[in-house]
Structure formats: C-alpha cells, structure tokens
UniProtKB/Swiss-Prot annotation:
GO terms for biological process: peptide biosynthetic process. It comes from Flavobacterium psychrophilum (strain ATCC 49511 / DSM 21280 / CIP 103535 / JIP02/86). GO terms for molecular function: translation elongation factor activity. PROSITE patterns: EFP. Pathway: Protein biosynthesis; polypeptide chain elongation. Belongs to the elongation factor P family. GO terms for cellular component: cytoplasm. Pfam families: EFP, EFP_N, Elong-fact-P_C. InterPro entries: Elong-fact-P_C, NA-bd_OB-fold, Rib_uL2_dom2, Transl_elong_fac_P/YeiP, Transl_elong_KOW-like, Transl_elong_P/YeiP_cen, Transl_elong_P/YeiP_CS, Transl_elongation_fac_P. Involved in peptide bond synthesis. Stimulates efficient translation and peptide-bond synthesis on native or reconstituted 70S ribosomes in vitro. Probably functions indirectly by altering the affinity of the ribosome for aminoacyl-tRNA, thus increasing their reactivity as acceptors for peptidyl transferase. Keywords: Cytoplasm, Elongation factor, Protein biosynthesis. This is Elongation factor P. SUPFAM superfamilies: Nucleic acid-binding proteins, Translation proteins SH3-like domain. It is found in: Cytoplasm.
Length: 187
C-alpha cells in the first residue's frame, strides 16, 4: 500500500475495482483544512478519464508493473500485433488500449506496461513524436494567410493531420503522438 505522497504521473493504481493510470496530479495545501491531492485517472480497461480527489495520507493500492519494449508489426482489424524486441515473443493488443493507433508505423518501438501479477498488458506508451511521410496533401491556396492557415493531409499510415499550407506530398513531418498534431517539417 502506498500513500498520496507517493502519487506520480504514470503510476498504476487499483481504484473502484478497476486499474487506473495517473495522468495528472496536483498536491493542494489550502490555508484552512487538510491537504489533498487532485488526480486525473485513466481507466486501463475502457480508456475513460476520471477526476478524483484523495485526502492527504489516504492509502492507495499500487499495481506493480513492468515496462518492456515492443516493436509494432501489423494491424488486423481492431487487433494490433507487437513483438518483444528481447524475447521475440509476439502479443496481440486491442485498439482501445492504444492512445493514437492511427499514427503507428510498422517497425515503431513502443513501451508496453504489463501487470506483473496477471501478465496482462495494461497500457502502451508511444514515442513522444513520430516522423511520417505525407502521401496526400490538398493544394494550398496562397493569400488569406494573415493567421496560421492549415490544410488537411494524409500520412503514410492513413491518418489525417492538419498541416501548414507549405507542406506538400512527399514531405516528411514530425507529429506529436499524444495530440496527433503537426510539430515541424523534417528535412
């Protein structure tokens, strides 16, 4: 059992008969009254986000997890296939456990958190950014660009991303995997 002082981003806890991953937390010490911790939890079974407040000193049930590096192989419907790069063991994960599956490119390394008690995968952490090639980009209309004008572009994985007007087919772009947004053009 851990206490609220042990809370950190990425910690997996058992709460309300489900396993949650802490996305955000904030220790609050008001002028009057006891301290507390505001948390944002994501359910690892269904992906829903829950806001919860723990009082200071509250005991939480920490879930022991191991992190392994897996390589993305291919997708088959809603099933995504990965291979452990150390043991070459293959696993199949459901689409709902992934944050942004449309950005996964074959050969991409991801970090898979596995519950040590049940050996079940809990979550998949993609790299912070990924470089993909633009396969289709709408033509950019010059003029009327007083603001940050964007257009829709399709990348090699089939995902649609909003990009600046100067991006053309064949360009490689860097994409933030957490938000799925354009970061920069790569030379």
């Amino acid at each position: 059992m851990a206490s609220t002082s042990d809370i950190r981003n990425g910690l997996c806890i058992k709460f309300n008969h489900d396993i949650y991953k802490i996305i955000e937390f904030l220790h609050v010490k008001p002028g009057k009254g006891p301290a507390f911790v505001r948390t944002k939890l994501r359910s690892l079974s269904n992906g829903k986000v829950l806001d919860n407040t723990f009082s200071a000193g509250h005991k939480i049930d920490e879930v022991r997890v191991e992190t392994h590096t897996y390589q993305y192989l291919y997708a088959e419907g809603d099933q995504f296939h990965f291979m452990n790069i150390e043991s070459f063991e293959q696993i199949t994960l459901d689409k709902k456990i992934l944050d942004n599956p449309g950005l996964l490119k074959e050969g991409t390394n991801v970090m898979v958190q596995v519950n040590t008690e049940t050996d079940l995968p809990l979550s998949v952490d993609m790299p912070a950014s990924i470089i993909l090639e633009v396969t289709y980009a709408e033509p950019g209309v010059k003029g009327n660009t007083a603001t940050n004008a964007t257009k829709s572009a399709t990348v090699e994985t089939g995902a649609s991303i909003n990009v600046p007007l100067f991006i053309n087919e064949g360009d490689k772009i860097k994409i933030d995997t957490a938000s799925g947004s354009y970061m920069e053009r790569v030379k």
